[in-house]
Regions:
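HIT superfamily nucleotide-processing domains
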Residues: 1-130
Length: 130
């Protein structure tokens, strides 16, 4: 996946056909973004926010939509926190070229020490306080 178009998905033509994409059930959508359940959830409720159009502005809408969704879950006390992220490039773990944002619910006790959050993508760098 050294092709720049594969590493930076919002620079490619938007892929209408999502066959082979890492999402399953459509759970919500608005004018700019579709929300799917992740096929390989990290935690219960792991969602993918997929822009409908190939523009960086709509990618920003996907990020904003994910944050708003997470905030609602916090206010409703369904989640205790959340992680938000993207994998861009093979070195970052990107396995498909569809642009999407991961919203991963977190609950107290779902791991012994969550300090560092997303920094755990490289386990020995995760807890920067040790």
């Amino acid at each position: 996946m050294n092709d720049l178009a594969k590493m930076i998905p919002w620079e490619t033509d938007y892929i209408e056909d999502s066959k082979g994409a890492p999402w399953t059930e459509l759970v919500d959508e608005d004018y700019h973004v579709k929300v799917f359940r992740d096929m390989y959830p990290v935690t219960e409720g792991h969602l993918l926010f997929v822009p409908k159009y190939n523009t960086i502005a709509v990618m920003n809408d996907a990020v904003a939509s994910a944050i708003r969704h997470g905030e609602r879950k916090l206010l409703d006390q369904e989640w205790d926190g959340f992680n938000l992220g993207m994998n861009v490039g093979e070195a970052a773990g990107q396995t498909c070229t569809w642009p999407h944002v991961h919203l991963i619910p977190r609950r107290n006790g779902d791991m012994p020490d969550p300090t560092g959050g997303v920094r755990h993508v490289i386990p020995e760098k995760g807890n920067y306080r040790k």
